[in-house]
Regions:
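Long, low-complexity serine/threonine/glycine- and acidic-rich segments characteristic of extracellular
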Residues: 47-52, 59-189
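Conserved, short, structured surface segments that act as functional micro-motifs
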Residues: 1-58
């Protein structure tokens, strides 16, 4: 925020003194904003990954529209399963708003499971100040640049700090054998 005097911006944080972990003041109940609007998942993308002679390569994203049910859960607008390669990851395009506020907010948590087994969880919560420069490592920039929403990669990049990921199996990569059908669930908070 900009200081009323026109001076430098002010930034406030609450941290655990001993560990220097940042408190999420909303989830900790320190601040209770008027907010009963859940985050909205706009689209889901799937990207297949592989290596060619030791060099990482990835496919173009396959994009899927979603629709929200009356109960608040989402499903793809298509009925047939998503065609997936032997390994890949999901990217979630989502937005969060709060009551009475026009601008959007980022998600603070995203989770992925496959066949009921947790594979990935990202939390924008509890990291130390020195790691705050790494908190955007989950953004999938090729889509983020043209989206009005937050675009989160449900996979850990090679140099991304582990503190952002309380759940991580195979760096979030979903593996699928030929002919295998897997059921994936994605949650956004």
């Amino acid at each position: 925020t900009r200081a009323p005097s026109g001076g430098p911006p002010l930034h406030y944080e609450l941290r655990d003194t001993r560990t220097q972990r940042l408190y999420n003041v909303v989830s900790a109940g320190i601040i209770r904003p008027d907010d009963d609007l859940p985050p909205r998942i706009m689209r889901i993308h799937y990207i297949e990954v592989d290596t060619v002679q030791g060099i990482p390569v990835h496919s173009r994203p396959e994009s899927y529209a979603v629709v929200r049910s009356a109960g608040g859960s989402y499903r793809l607008t298509r009925e047939e399963p998503v065609g997936a390669g032997r390994k890949g990851y999901f990217v979630v395009e989502a937005s969060d708003r709060r009551n009475g506020v026009g601008n959007t907010f980022g998600l603070w948590r995203l989770a992925l499971s496959a066949d009921g087994k947790p594979l990935f969880e990202y939390r924008m919560d509890g990291f130390e100040q020195a790691q705050s420069r790494c908190c955007d490592a989950v953004s999938y920039y090729p889509l983020q640049l043209t989206s009005r929403n937050e675009v989160i990669r449900a996979a850990q990049l090679a140099q991304s700090p582990a503190c952002f990921y309380p759940v991580m199996e195979e760096r979030g990569i979903v593996r699928t054998e030929a002919g295998q059908t897997r059921r994936s669930r994605i949650g956004a908070w």
